[in-house]
């Protein structure tokens, strides 16, 4: 001690000078004590060092206050936005780390920092102030942010890295603030019920709350919870050295309560909240600093009625006055998917729409989709004119609810609602607004997915043939459709059916009956009536464009019919009454099997009066049948109006892409000629959307593309035209053929001798009748033709003469 005191007594002035000479080292008295300088060993006394050190470079000043019971604070929509959106974005940024805590001038060796910067500020302080409801208005918080950035620019050189980092953060700050609600409104905050179960510090609080009259002090927690005195609601006072109950009339006095209350960082004591009876404590779950709950009913509370801190709210981006569950968007969505399956199946297109909706609500797009999750809360956001401008609000939660309730009949209704939501956004907000950019981004996602909408699968229905066929349709539609699919398959079917007829020859000839005879006669008369109808329709109605393939088939059928007729004539000469029957079914089967038309004219059994069995009538029926098919199916208008399946459209798109450049002009011409809405569009930049094109346009495009690519058509409606015959000639030919058949049918009615035998058992349906008739006649014709091959040519000529 003497060594230390002696130099002090001898050289007080030198001691001071020596300390000044230490420079920056002297700024930290602790350092000097631990590492004394050898040069100034005589002046290193603790008493001398302590006084000048405090004068020259004081230690870091206390950090800015984060709570002040004398200063009222509150929760507003703008402050909540600054806390949940702005602060969250800045805090996570890679350049945020220098700004997360106050500047430590001693540690960083910046002795002049606090001389230049009179009001230090950092993001950690701002964050804690937001959590503690320190601010009364958002402008105060924004002022703190600006102070933080300005301090950085004032103290550092413009070229320093820290300045560039601050500029980056400030730019993000200004972008986020641009999306902040324009009008500030105070929020009523509700507290989650189970919040007291979470958090380490809150566990200590739970043990400390006993009753309204027993309030232990908790020294480890620096926040104060204040309650009103009703006995069922406990009152907790933290950091107060004696248990006490603070009633509402005394709340104002707490502002000047002295040192014990200086550390209070909860919501100011005068913040009333809706009274919750029987709830003993509410604790914060989102921040490490628990706040207290102030019960209502305090007449002395400051105006505006403030709530506990905003950190109590779950992290949501849209402000609302009602309790909000944590926004786990995908889980409820998947659960509702299971529920929706019970309500009825969605169509393929609506399933696709549901998938789009799930994607829009997924976390992948949450960064720019969150403003559209819930309906716009105009009152909370301070948008008083919103509902004056937007007459039909829409949001994704409403779309989702409508989808679950099966309110959408088709994909167009779904798309209309989603687009309405985006158009509302564009209508209300200025074009340079952040939310407009978010809407455009989300709409791009929607439109991209919606463009991949699958076609609804066409329900298998009856072919158009059935519309023009007489009521006694006997041939199964499967036979007719298979025939039309390819000419080769039709000829194979004819051969197979002929074989079947021959196999059943003996069985069919074995038993004749009066009943069968009556059935047969009814069939023939029905055929006759059908022939009359077809003849009248052909002569009166407009000539429909015949299809090439069907005309080719007709020619084939005619030639076969002539052969069969010749064969039948020979049979008549040899076998008498039985010969016509074989020839007729064979013809009906050949013509009907190939064109599925012989069946079309058969009527139900027992339709007409009994009479002579008609031997050649089926032959006539077979001849009359082929025109029946063109009458129903040949109309190009009907064919063109047939909608395309998804696969056909996809194939057409691929084929159009294969076309050479010079052929695309014709494609554009076809589209513009048939689509009035596209006539004015620029041919250079026309955009083809197959969903909007008419079926007739698509069919015309398909024909053109196939002709360009020289592909064999997939469908039977594109068939080569017979060379050298006009439409009129073909129609006249048909007419003559029908007249000839009519004469043959009437001749058969007059000269029927013996009816077929077992057809009654096979006439449950009209198609069964036809099969039976054709098989009976075919079998007998085959057997007879073998014995009368020599006379077939003569019978053929006589047949043609009678025609």
Swiss-Prot record:
Residue span of region Disordered: 53-73, 268-348, 456-652, 739-803
Subcellular location: Nucleus; Chromosome
Main location class: nucleus
In-chain residues carrying the UniProt-annotated modification Phosphoserine: 37, 298, 301, 635
Compositional bias segments (type: Basic residues): 545-567
Record CDD domains: Bromo_Brdt_I_like (cd05497), Bromo_Brdt_II_like (cd05498)
Gene Ontology molecular function: any one: lysine-acetylated histone binding
Motif (Nuclear localization signal): 556-560
Domain named Bromo: residues: 74-180, 344-453
This protein's UniProt keywords: Acetylation, Bromodomain, Chromatin regulator, Chromosome, Nucleus, Phosphoprotein, Repeat, Transcription, Transcription regulation
Comp. bias regions, Acidic residues: 481-515
Positions carrying Phosphothreonine: 6
Pfam family, one: Bromodomain
Domain notes: The first bromo domain specifically recognizes histone H4 acetylated at 'Lys-12' (H4K12ac). It also specifically binds histone H4 acetyl-methylated at 'Lys-5' and 'Lys-12' (H4K5acme and H4K12acme, respectively). The second bromo domain recognizes and binds histone H4 acetylated at 'Lys-5' and 'Lys-12' (H4K5ac and H4K12ac, respectively).
Known role: Chromatin reader protein that specifically recognizes and binds histone H4 acetylated at 'Lys-5' and 'Lys-12' (H4K5ac and H4K12ac, respectively), thereby controlling gene expression and remodeling chromatin structures. Recruits transcription factors and coactivators to target gene sites, and activates RNA polymerase II machinery for transcriptional elongation.
Subunit organization: Homodimer. Interacts with E2F1. Interacts with (acetylated) STAT3; promoting STAT3 recruitment to chromatin. Interacts with CTCF; promoting BRD2 recruitment to chromatin.
Protein name: Bromodomain-containing protein 2
